């Protein structure tokens, strides 16, 4: 019970067991909601925009990482799939 006397695994300042603080993360903002011009430019032919949301292996980056809202993530995925089907974006990179 020696840990309880010293504050236990959780320190008095909110540190966790391994010294990490319970910090609040900065909320990600949807780039398409913030910039309407970018949303208007979202098209399967605009490979420069679509490449930002695809990994180097050809996978679509999930919205929890990019910060896009659900509405725009679905639209983005639709345009990426269109671009892949006509050959502007690769399905996978070897």
Curated annotation (Swiss-Prot):
The keyword Nucleus does not apply. GO terms for molecular function: small ribosomal subunit rRNA binding; structural constituent of ribosome. GO terms for cellular component: cytosolic small ribosomal subunit. It comes from the Bacteria. Keywords: Ribonucleoprotein, Ribosomal protein, RNA-binding, rRNA-binding. Disulfide bonds: none annotated. One of its GO terms (biological process) is translation. Part of the 30S ribosomal subunit. Forms a tight heterodimer with protein bS6. Belongs to the bacterial ribosomal protein bS18 family. This is Small ribosomal subunit protein bS18. It comes from Leptospira biflexa serovar Patoc (strain Patoc 1 / ATCC 23582 / Paris). The gene is rpsR.
């Amino acid at each position: 019970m020696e840990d309880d006397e010293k504050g236990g695994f959780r320190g008095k300042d909110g540190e966790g067991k391994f010294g990490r603080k319970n910090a609040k993360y900065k909320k990600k903002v949807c780039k398409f909601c913030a910039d309407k011009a970018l949303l208007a430019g979202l098209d399967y032919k605009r490979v420069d925009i679509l490449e930002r949301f695809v990994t180097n292996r050809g996978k679509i980056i999930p919205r929890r990482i990019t910060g896009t809202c659900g509405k725009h993530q679905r639209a983005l995925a639709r345009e990426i799939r269109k671009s892949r089907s006509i050959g502007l974006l690769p399905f996978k990179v070897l």
